[in-house]
Amino acid sequence: YYIHPAAPPWYVAKYGFDFMLGVPGDVAGLGAFDDMTGLGIFNGLYGRNANVFAAVPSLHSAYTLVAFIYALRSHSPRWITAALGIITLGIWFTAVYTSHHYIIDVSLGILCALAGYLIFEYLLMRWRPFARFIDRYAAYVAPRRR
């Protein structure tokens, strides 16, 4: 988003296509949740967003897809994989429905996740020094139970 700043739908609806730095973040469609619950969760998160021009690619879409892919690969219990699949689809839908992303943003996020997964698994993990580092790191952060 530093190379190609892209405004989300809520920004275009509010300010048009003028590039204005210093515009505060906006909760957009997620404000309805805050209004219904009285919690102010999304106002607290998005209201302080320092960079409103980070819509492309949608990292919300990418992160959830990566979690889902690794749940599939790890042979997690079916209910966990199903839950992550539903959450992933829900985030993709919600990102567009609440005016935080366009469909193209979500699509590019999905492509980034797939590209990252393929690069990591089929290029980097085949390079021995990198694979050894990852194995040592995994052992360090998740020691085996005895």
Task: Annotate the PLM regions.
Residues 5-13, 55, 90-116:
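Interfacial helix-loop-helix junctions of multi-pass membrane proteins
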Residues 68-73, 113-121:
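Hydrophobic transmembrane alpha-helices
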Residues 119-146:
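Membrane-proximal cytoplasmic C-terminal regulatory module of class A 7TM GPCRs
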Residues 2-74:
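Membrane-interfacial catalytic/cofactor-binding modules of polytopic membrane enzymes
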Residues 72-82:
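Membrane-interface helix-loop-helix junctions at transmembrane boundaries of multi-pass membrane enzymes
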Residues 16-18, 86-90, 109-114, 126-133:
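Active/binding-pocket-proximal capping segment
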Residues 5-12, 74, 102, 124-132:
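Perimembrane helix-loop junctions in membrane proteins
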Residues 1, 80-97:
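Small-polar-interrupted transmembrane alpha-helices in polytopic inner-membrane proteins
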